[in-house]
């Protein structure tokens, strides 16, 4: 995690040069030196562009060991497809977890021809990979081209998991470890007659706005391991038409079932009880 912070300038250069790179960030608590516990405090840094300039990373958020393996394979394909850095954003809990993983063969994905690489100029025009523009006009054209690419990514690469949302009156939104915890909360609440559902973003950027298009829930709770970052994207996704609340633990701590039930009871006037 600290290395990602130190390398933000380099990541900005990679985005400007449109180089396909895969970056892994196992997010631990901070700021500063921080601790080794689980955290999701790098959400803003990862999804909004941590370095200088109007750039974006494709950000994938696994919730278990198998997905850390699968999404890393996917990240290389997405990086090649879009000529863009891709970040796999896990957290300290996942990074220290031991689970069975099925080692899969890489899929034969049809990727664009690399007509930009500098592999020798025999019998063709020269190519140049650069992250700078010497005139304002060229710089603006580059910026507009990047934004068009980012819009294409938003249109085609949004990914999420939904769980028990078809009849849900209330929703939890959580990614990574929080998404994993939230699924057990949904099952426990359903056992007590509360129609709770889960949306687990898999791409944090592009944020899966499409997952919220037909949601008619009475309220939403975002579950995060930070001081409230993803909640901003959830509010934008529902156009602030649904009340969105927030619960978190920080510093490497994880939320308990009773604490989440207490928050749901408080915000939505429910009567959920642990252990029923």
What feature does the model see in each segment?
Residues 1-48, 58-79:
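Thiamine diphosphate
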